[in-house]
């Protein structure tokens, strides 16, 4: 995939999702104090962002190892952890105006298990009205600022990794940087 294809198929959509996320700040400030705030808009964004993350990780994993069947996230995580140096430690921070929050979306990776935010996504997607035994609230409440921000950070990090490794032959062109309005520039 070349740069133009990457921009067309993935980056434009990321920027669209990021803009939708930033539009929520009219109602909810992007800061840790609001992490538990949930809404229909966060639910919509959470599902869209996680679907996009699923798509880009599928393409990345297929470039490493062709599979006759679609890989689930546990399978993808194993491939990602094996093929991306320091995968669990990849992090990004929000820009200063958003409290400079450091996010490590993959840090809780364990073999045969997905990340907390991905588990929350699946519960929101498939068991939205079920009551969580810990919180005593429906899983709908997991469509909150924290999970949306973490999922968006994972997508941003992964798009950067994908672009650097699969679209630019491992070299970063200083004339083309994947700028985010939410996150600081990705550092390898």
Feature-to-residue mapping (PLM):
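Substrate-binding/catalytic groove segments of enzymes
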Residues: 116, 125-140, 159-167
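Charged alpha-helical initiation segments
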Residues: 1-47
């Amino acid at each position: 995939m070349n740069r133009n294809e990457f921009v067309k198929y993935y980056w434009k959509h990321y920027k669209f999702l990021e803009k939708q996320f930033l539009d929520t700040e009219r109602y909810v400030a992007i800061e840790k104090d609001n992490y538990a705030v949930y809404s229909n808009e966060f639910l919509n964004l959470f599902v869209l962002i996680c679907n996009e993350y699923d798509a880009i990780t599928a393409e990345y994993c297929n470039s490493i190892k062709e599979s006759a069947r679609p890989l689930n996230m546990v399978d993808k995580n194993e491939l990602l952890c094996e093929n991306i140096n320091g995968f669990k430690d990849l992090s990004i921070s929000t820009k200063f105006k958003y409290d400079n929050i450091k996010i490590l979306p993959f840090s809780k990776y364990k073999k045969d298990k997905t990340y907390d935010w991905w588990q929350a996504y699946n519960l929101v997607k498939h068991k939205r009205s079920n009551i969580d035994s810990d919180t005593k609230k429906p899983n709908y409440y997991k469509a909150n600022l924290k999970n949306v921000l973490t999922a968006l950070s994972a997508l941003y990090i992964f798009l950067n990794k994908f672009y650097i490794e699969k679209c630019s032959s491992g070299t970063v062109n200083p004339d083309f940087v994947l700028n985010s309005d939410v996150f600081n520039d990705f550092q390898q």
